[in-house]
Amino acid sequence: MDTIIMIPVATAIVSLLVGTVIGYAIRKHSWEQKVQNAQNDADHILADARAQVAAVKAEVNAQKQAAEAVKQSAENTKKEKILEAQEQIRDYKQKTEDKLNLKKDDLARQENRLKQREDTLDHKNSLLDEREAGLTKKEDQLKQQYTSLKAKLTEADELVEARRQKLYDVAKLDKEEAKKIVLNKLSDELVKERAELIRNSNEEVKAKADHYASQIIVDAIQSSAADTVAETTVSVVDLPNEEMKGRIIGREGRNIRSFEALTGIDLIIDDTPKVVTLSGFDPIRREIAKRAMERLIKDGRIHPARIEEMVDKARKEVNDDIYEAGESALMELGIHRMNPELVKTLGRLKYRTSYGQNVLSHSIEVGKLAGTMAAELGLDEKLAVRAGLLHDIGKAIDHDIEGSHVEIGVELTRKYHESDVVVNAIAAHHGDVPKLSFIAELVVAADTISSARPGARSESLENYIRRLTELEKIAKSYQGVKQAYAIQAGREVRVMVEPDEISDDRTVILARDIRNQVEKELDYPGNIKITVIREKRVVAIAK
């Protein structure tokens, strides 16, 4: 019974132990499972945390890289902006320096011009001072000479009286004879003093004026040149054959009559082969006739209606050429704003000659010379050029209007409102009225230079012979002149004097007197040189 009782107890104990063990095992397994789950959860959480940390790190790195990129971009942009700003600064600095250099160059050029002008003014002032000093010195010398001459005259009067008395007492001459001897002696002495004074004055004036005047004139002449033409009153037109003469004459000479009536030019048909001659004093009409005849010959149809048509065309063509010649002259001299009618009148000078010199070419040359000399003297160069160009404008229409070319030129320029200086230069260039300006003086000088240069002008044979004869006649009219010769086409007169009648001192006075008479009585182009030669030969024959 006890055993039976022990078995259940043992079983119960064993069961309890087994249950305890099993419960412990189950509980342990459960705890292990929970621990494992917790560990897994912790691993998951740690993995998630690590993933989040990695993501945050990646995001931080990305942001850091982005920040670095932004920073780098900002740095690059900053550098670019700095470089761009530096480039702009360099460009601005370079431009500023270039502008400053240009301004410096301009200022330097202006300074050089001002310095040159100042030097020129100083030079001119020096010349004026020298001239003033020379004039003052000359005035003092003249005063001294006047005082000396006055004293000499007083002394001469006393000497004359003393000699008169002495001659009267010693030679027993009457008063008139003694007076004649003394006056002849005194006249010889005064002639000697006068000749010496003339020589000294001429040398002094020449020494002071030659260099400066020559320099101005040479500069003016070197900058100018003009062609020369031969003066003529006929034009010759070539014909292709002799038959053309008959066609030009026409039935009963009607073509010639029509041509001459329309042109105002004589048509001469003679035995000269293959030419016809146009004769007339108006060069413009002659040019119109020549062009019309050349057109008719080329066309071949010659009858009054065709002649009238060709003359009208030639007249229009010549009028166009005249205006173009006037405009070309203005362009060559740089003259602007001139009345068209005055330009047309100026162009007519192309067909006008004076002593064989083309008047338009001469006027252009005078304008250049006057302008050059005006510039050298500090005067208005453009006004001088204008006055020089227009000084002979009256010659363009002096065949059509009554009056001298000077009067016509003055009236014409006043009509078209040219300045008073230009009008006075025209009026005074032949000495008809006083010169009221330095420019008028320059126009006269330029006109003389242009006319007097070799080859510029020629004369007709009749005028040439007459002028030479009158030159020799004037020279021979003086007492003591043995012979006189006009040489070098009348540009020099050589006067041979009797050595026993004319002294060396008196030759100076004789040359001066002949020059004054030539200037007063003769009209001539250029200058005439008067040369007085006194030669005494003594011959002794040894036997």
UniProtKB/Swiss-Prot annotation:
Domain KH: 233-296
Bilayer-crossing regions: 4-24
SMART domains with a match to the protein in the record: HDc, KH
Family that this chain belongs to: Belongs to the RNase Y family.
Domain HD: 359-452
CDD domains: HDc, KH-I_RNaseY
Name of this protein: Ribonuclease Y
Pfam families noted in UniProt: HD (PF01966), KH_1 (PF00013), RNase_Y_N (PF12072)
